[in-house]
A protein has these predicted regions:
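Short pre-catalytic strand/loop immediately N-terminal to key active-site residues, enriched for Gly-Thr
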Residues: 2-18, 155-156
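A structural preference for short, hydrophobic beta-strand core positions in alpha/beta folds
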Residues: 7, 158-161, 186
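DPxDG-like acidic metal-binding loop motif
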Residues: 15-43
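Glycine-rich beta-strand-to-loop/alpha-helix junction loops that act as flexible
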Residues: 19-20, 159-163
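Short, well-structured alpha-helical segments that form the helix of a local strand-helix-strand
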Residues: 40-50, 146-147, 176-178
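Conserved, helical-rich catalytic subdomain that frames metal- and/or nucleotide-binding sites
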Residues: 58-60, 65-155, 170-200
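Short beta-strand->loop micro-motif that forms the acidic, two-metal-ion catalytic signature
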Residues: 164-168
Length: 200
């Protein structure tokens, strides 16, 4: 069989939201079901890791604490939370960010134990993004996005290698006074991947 796959979504490239990795994971799950190969989630994960470091996370199907290069996953309970996404009209290359000599690689690692100690309603305050300072030098608009969102939510920060910025959004109104060419979206996080049940 030769599946024809057409995909439409609103995520731009180089957004730092794992769009490509999510697509890869969904494709693996769909082919596993279509071709009735009955590969286990563990087997799919081994394949997914060869496609990209973030693919195993999307194959897991749960919110997770991720370590290593993306293959060490611990499922966590994280309640559905409203978020605001804000992205300038430019993207960033992940390779470019990781090759930057100014990227700090010796910061103290965050731990799942520290995350577990925080009450659910404050978990969004945990953590940091070590890629953000470097990304901001390559794309100053990221800093502008962070500053704008921090006016509403102090925990605003960049996601992935950029260039999207996110913050929990418990307000009833939309963002105000943003440039017309910036992408923004109010969304709700999911407790599970919609296709999680397609793998054992």
């Amino acid at each position: 069989r030769h599946p024809l796959r057409m995909l439409f979504h609103g995520l731009g490239t180089q957004a730092g939201l794992g769009g490509g990795s999510s697509d890869a994971a969904s494709t693996l799950l769909a082919l596993n079901k279509l071709w009735r190969t009955r590969l286990s989630r563990q087997e799919l994960t081994a394949i997914g890791l060869q496609l990209g470091a973030d693919v195993p996370f999307f194959l897991l199907g749960d919110n997770a604490w991720v370590e290593g290069i993306g293959e060490q996953l611990t499922a966590i309970d994280y309640p559905p939370t409203p978020f605001m996404l804000l992205k300038p009209p430019v993207g960033l290359s992940t390779i470019q960010i990781f090759k930057d000599p100014n990227l700090k690689r010796d910061t103290k690692p965050a731990t799942i134990a520290g995350f577990a100690e925080i009450e659910n309603e404050h978990k969004h305050l945990f953590g940091r993004n070590d890629l953000q300072p470097v990304a901001e030098t390559h794309c100053p608009d990221i800093r502008h996005c962070v500053d704008l969102l921090k006016g509403y939510q102090p925990s605003a920060r960049m996601t992935g290698s950029g260039s999207t910025v996110f913050a929990p959004w418990f307000l009833n109104h939309d963002l105000q006074a943003i440039p017309s060419n910036w992408y923004h979206l109010r969304c709700m996080s999911l407790k599970n991947h919609p296709l999680k049940h397609w793998a054992d």
